[in-house]
Amino acid sequence: MLDDIRGPGDLQGLSKRELDLLADEIREFLIHKVAATGGHLGPNLGVVELSLALHRVFESPYDPIIFDTGHQAYVHKILTGRAGDFDTLRQKDGLSGYPSRAESEHDWVESSHASTALSYADGLAKAFELTGQRRRHVVAVVGDGAMTGGMCWEALNNIAAAEHRRIIIVVNDNGRSYAPTIGGLASHLAGLRLTPSYEKVLDESKKLLRGMPVVGPLAYALMHSLKVGVKDAVSPQVMFTDLGLKYVGPVDGHDEHAVEDALRRARGYGGPVIVHVITRKGMGYAPAEDDEAEQMHSTGIIDPKTGRAIKASAPGWTSVFSDALIDVASEHRNIVAITAAMPGPTGLSKFGERFPDRLFDVGIAEQHAVTSAAGLAMGGLHPVVAIYSTFLNRAFDQVMMDVALHRLPVTFVLDRAGITGSDGASHNGMWDLSILNVVPGMRVAAPRDASRLREELTEALAVDDGPTALRFPKGEVGEDIPAIERRDGVDILARPASGLHADVLLVAVGSFASTALATADRLGKQGIGVTVVDPRWVLPVPPHVVELAGQHRLVVTLEDSGVHGGAGSAVTAAMQDADVDIPSRDIGVPQQFLEHASRGQVLEELGLTDQHIARKITGWVAAMSREIGDSTVNPAAQQVD
C-alpha cells in the first residue's frame, strides 16, 4: 500500500482495516530503512498512527504541522511523498533526519532543538489572524520530553489567552510521565467538553446561577466542583485546563481511529485545544520495546532482525569521559553531575548508577540546568554539566551571569563539539569556543586524545575559583598522541625536521592534533619547517604559545570550530597584546550553517584535511617569501600533493 501514498490526499479514502495495514507496512519500512542508515528509530515507530491521523484530519501544508522535536517526523516525511528517498536518510545530499524547508512545503520549520514548536505555532496563528486567514489551523506535535522545556510553558501562557486562535497542541506522551486513563468515559467527556452547545449551556448557567441571591453562588460552586471533580477523576491534566486550555484525552495513540476522532473534535472547536496522546516509543519492534533505557531512540547501522549494531564500535569520547568522571568522583564526594534529559548520550548513565544521589536530570531545561549548577556550586559542591555543545547556546546568559559573574566552580563538558556530520546544521557544535571566548574567567580545554581527556577533566575539577569547560567531538577516540615535551602546560607534538627553519607554528586545537601532525609531515617534505603544539587549555591562550609564536615566521591555528571568535581569534589577540608582530592565520569552520553529511565528507568539503591545509599554508609561506625575497623556502613547496 505504501507505494500508492504520494501525498496526504491518498490517505483520505482508506478504510480502518487499510489504515491498520498501512501502519504495519510503515513500521516495517522504517525498521529496514533506518537499520541501513542509522537514525531516530524508536520515536518514529511510536508515532505511526498519530501521523496518519494528523494527515487525514488536517490539510497540510495549508494547516502547518510542526514537530517538536523534529526527529519524530520520519512518518510525516513518508506520508508527504518522500518514502523513495529514505535510502539517503542523513546522507550527503540526501534526506534530512529532521524537517527541512528545502525538502518539502509540508516542512514549515527546521525543528530539531526541543520545546520550540508551541512558540512557532503561536506566531503562525497570530500571523494567519492578522492576514485574514483565520480558518487555518496550526498543529504542534510536542513529544519526547519537550514539555519539560520552559519555552513550552511560556508559549502556553500566551496561547491560552487567545481563545479564538485555532491551535491544536498534540502532546505525544511516550514517557509515561503522567498517569493516563484511556477508555470510553474519557473519550465521552472529551467530546462533551468540546461541544459548542455544552459551552453555551455552561456559560448561560454561570450567569443565571451567579445572579440568584444566596443560593446562586453556592449552586454555581457546586456545579463547578462537580465538573472539576469528574474531570480530575478521569485525567490528571488539570494543569492545562487551569491555564484556560481545552483538554481532550488521554487517547490511545496506537488506535488510529481514536486519535483521528479526538483530532476532529479538537479541529471543530475553533480555539486552542490540547490533545493528549499516549504512545509507546519503539512500538511494534521487539528490540526497541525491550530496550528499557532508550527504546532505541537513536541507532547506528543495525541488523534489522536483532537490532544489534553491525559493526562493534571502538571506544568513543563519551565513554572515556564517563569512566573518567566516575574515577574522579569516587575520590571527591563534592562532585555532582547534571544532565538536561540526556544521561545516556552524554555519558552520565553509569555515573547515575554508581552515585544515584549525585546525578540530577532536570529535563529539557538547559537554562535551569546551568543556574541550578550555580546553586550547587554556591553550596560547596563542584557540578559537572554534561551537555551537547550545540545545546549550550540555549543557556548562554546563565553561563555568563549566573556562573561566571559569581566565579563559581562549574565544569561544562561539551560533547559533540565541532562537526557532528549526519545530524546537520542544528547539531554541529561549532559555536562553543566563540561563545565561551567572551565569558570572563572561563577556561576551556580541548583534549586531543583519551589520556588528555582524563588528565584535563581532573585538572578542571580541581579549579575552585571559576568555571571551566572541556570540549570533544562525536565518535571514536583515536590512538593517544604523545608529546615530545611539555612546557608551561603546552604540549610540543612536533618540531621542524633536521635542517629546516622554524617557519610555521601550527597550533592544534583538540582532536585536530592528528590532522596537524599529518599537515606538518606534508610541509616538511616540501622544505617548510613546522612546530606543532597542543595548548591543551585553549582559552585563555597559554603565554608559552605566544612566546613560541615570536620564534616563527607564521602562526596558524587549526580548529574544529567557527573561525569567528574562536581559538584562532584568541591566539591573534594574545599575540597583539604581547606585541608579537608575526602574521597569523586561522583555519576552521566557516561561519555558516552546514548541510548534513558524514563528518569526513563535511571536513573534505570545507578543506579541513591535511592535504588541503598543507596546500593553503604552502601558499601563505610562498607569498611571504616573495615579499621579502627569501630564498630559504624550497620553491617546490608552492605545490603540495
UniProtKB/Swiss-Prot annotation:
GO terms for biological process: 1-deoxy-D-xylulose 5-phosphate biosynthetic process; isopentenyl diphosphate biosynthetic process, methylerythritol 4-phosphate pathway; terpenoid biosynthetic process; thiamine biosynthetic process. Mg(2+) binds at residues 144, 174. Signal peptide: none annotated. PROSITE patterns: TRANSKETOLASE_1, TRANSKETOLASE_2. Its cofactor is Mg(2+); thiamine diphosphate. Thiamine diphosphate binds at residues 71, 112-114, 145-146, 174, 285, 366. Its EC number is 2.2.1.7. Pathway: Metabolic intermediate biosynthesis; 1-deoxy-D-xylulose 5-phosphate biosynthesis; 1-deoxy-D-xylulose 5-phosphate from D-glyceraldehyde 3-phosphate and pyruvate: step 1/1. Catalyzes the acyloin condensation reaction between C atoms 2 and 3 of pyruvate and glyceraldehyde 3-phosphate to yield 1-deoxy-D-xylulose-5-phosphate (DXP). This is 1-deoxy-D-xylulose-5-phosphate synthase. It comes from Mycobacteroides abscessus (strain ATCC 19977 / DSM 44196 / CCUG 20993 / CIP 104536 / JCM 13569 / NCTC 13031 / TMC 1543 / L948) (Mycobacterium abscessus). The gene is dxs.
